[in-house]
Amino acid sequence: MSKIIKIAVDAMGGDNSPKKIIDGINHHYKSNTNTFYQIFGDKEKIQNYINQLPTSSFEIIHTKDLVKGTDSPLEGAKRGKNTSMWLAIQSVKEKKSDIVISAGNTGALLVISKLNLKMIENIDKPALSALWPNKKNMSVVLDLGANIECSPKNLIDFSIMGSSLFKSLYPDDTAKVALLNIGSEEIKGNETIKETYQQLNQRNNTDFEFKGYIEGNQLMNGDVNVIVADGFTGNIALKTAEGTANFITSELKKAMTGNIVGKISSLLNISNLKKFKERLDPRLYNGAIFIGLDSPVIKSHGGTDYIGFSNSLSVCTRIVTGNLIEKIRNNIC
């Protein structure tokens, strides 16, 4: 019998919650029946949507207090220890759950997580990471905004954590790490990135292959699968990629529906267009991972629907099954 995976869920964060959250749980449970959900939020509202789930697979911890999307990180933390977000994080701190997920305020989630959870030994800063599609499979990209300024040690830690995350999600593949830079030559970049390059090049990287630098126009090539940057650079890359994907899908839709020729072309290519649309569907890649703390914290996009939230729950399942925290501890020494 497989181990029961316990997920602490903030049911009140993000748009259209708790309905979206509970619908996502219902959808996730259909293919993950070895999951137990600790659900934090307004019990009366939650019970309106949870009738599809066996009562043995969940527990509702009632609270009407929540962190608002408009709160600053500090305001969110000051709302107190009875918010659904705080209580969910407290659950993993007390080892009542294996992992925590929220679609709520990102800044508040990071601050409350850091207030409650300890850093993994020998790691100075946590990082925000996410999954990106590439031509061959998927890539882990970090940091996406948790740390604006980073030292070479921070970037080396991110390389180790990112490769550990990749291996926990894709255990049969080799982690290949690259540093995001303005060029591929060794002389390019600032002093921090060049020093990081030198140290990674000289390090005995048994847990990953170091592939040097990668430029922004190569992120989706699939030649590497762990891309490391400081939070300032990484966040700009993330927003640029999201905007480009939205532009492409929007323009393609207009081209295919604008006139009779476009409509006929779209009908003739409906199978390929469907595959293309699915490849760019952000719901499939929903679920940013806050790593470096001694318990994993998952951030679902607040504007996603129940399918996107279900996919972020699947990321939770794979991370716990893949022993992410243990991998980081073993590799960071």
UniProtKB/Swiss-Prot annotation:
<comment type="pathway">
    <text>Lipid metabolism; phospholipid metabolism.</text>
</comment>
<dbReference type="InterPro" id="IPR012281">
    <property type="entry name" value="Phospholipid_synth_PlsX-like"/>
</dbReference>
<keyword id="KW-0594">Phospholipid biosynthesis</keyword>
<dbReference type="InterPro" id="IPR003664">
    <property type="entry name" value="FA_synthesis"/>
</dbReference>
<comment type="similarity">
    <text>Belongs to the PlsX family.</text>
</comment>
<keyword id="KW-0444">Lipid biosynthesis</keyword>
<dbReference type="GO" id="GO:0005737">
    <property type="term" value="C:cytoplasm"/>
</dbReference>
<dbReference type="GO" id="GO:0043811">
    <property type="term" value="F:phosphate:acyl-[acyl carrier protein] acyltransferase activity"/>
</dbReference>
<keyword id="KW-1208">Phospholipid metabolism</keyword>
<protein>
    <recommendedName>
        <fullName>Phosphate acyltransferase</fullName>
        <ecNumber>2.3.1.274</ecNumber>
    </recommendedName>
</protein>
<dbReference type="GO" id="GO:0006633">
    <property type="term" value="P:fatty acid biosynthetic process"/>
</dbReference>
<comment type="subunit">
    <text>Homodimer. Probably interacts with PlsY.</text>
</comment>
<keyword id="KW-0808">Transferase</keyword>
<comment type="function">
    <text>Catalyzes the reversible formation of acyl-phosphate (acyl-PO(4)) from acyl-[acyl-carrier-protein] (acyl-ACP). This enzyme utilizes acyl-ACP as fatty acyl donor, but not acyl-CoA.</text>
</comment>
<keyword id="KW-0443">Lipid metabolism</keyword>
<keyword id="KW-0963">Cytoplasm</keyword>
<dbReference type="Pfam" id="PF02504">
    <property type="entry name" value="FA_synthesis"/>
</dbReference>
<dbReference type="GO" id="GO:0008654">
    <property type="term" value="P:phospholipid biosynthetic process"/>
</dbReference>
